[in-house]
Amino acid sequence: MEAQRVVDCHVHVFDPQRFPYRPDTFYAPAGQELGTPARLRTVLDAHGVEHALLVGPNSGYGEDNRCLLDTLAAAAGRYRGMAVVANSTSRAELAELRAAGVSGVTVNAALLGVGYYADAGGLLADLAALDMIADVQVVDDQLVELAPLLERSGVRVHVDHCGRPDPGAGLGAAGFRELLRWGASARAVVKLSGCVKVSREPYPHRDLLPFVRALVDAFGPDRCVWGSDWPFLRMPERVDYGPLLTLLAEQVPDADARRRILWDTPVREYGLGGGSAQVAEGQCEHEPGAAPG
């Protein structure tokens, strides 16, 4: 049987020896949390993961994207990126990032609050015009408040970590219901990621199983992707990569659905595989403003 091809759609890189952290950083990853490009490559190679999406971290670097861009440039199309930018970033600056392999920018309301993005309408509209992505991270019911801004802009939206649901609040929590509603939008994709961050239980994180299955039902495997969240910030002990990858077989038992989640959907959404050269030249698989998938 042919091995399943894999794209990891949520990893971070930290290389403070080459790219020092900002002095005003929210958090300075250290020790087991460090994820240099060399370490990332070793982990991905060991588990047969062909591509990855590098999500610019607010921890350590914030709007300093030099480490991210250097890693993208050195990887010859293996990676795509999500940059952290100011709300005032111009369309020309976004286009430069796109040409460097950046697929979109982060909207981290979980850390910065929904109010931080009150003046981000222009940024989101420019992302939409360039067919780039808003990589959204929310907690609790923040998506309910953030949704109108995202919908008005027409931007493609990728939601991190299953929407970071509270397992104790259940499937009926307002924020999770809002995320399920987004399953009807052709512009939205959800990342089946962050199990270690969100779960209240040890591996295999069975308290998240109903949430993952509800998301796959709502979005379909053509608008779900998988991510590890390596190198697992703020964890009290080292987290093993391999078990998180194999856990998806329990969460999504259907092999064809897993194939689409692990490969087909991320290759399409991030312009990987055969589309690498076109994206590197600043072109996109989707027509600007068109709905993905």
What are these regions (language model features)?
Residues 62-141, 148-151, 191, 195:
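Active-site gating/metal-coordination segments in enzymes
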Residues 117-225:
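Catalytic pocket-lining loop regions of alpha/beta-barrel enzymes
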Residues 10, 44, 68, 127, ...:
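Conserved, mostly hydrophobic/aromatic
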Residues 34-43, 88-97, 175:
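Short, acidic/polar
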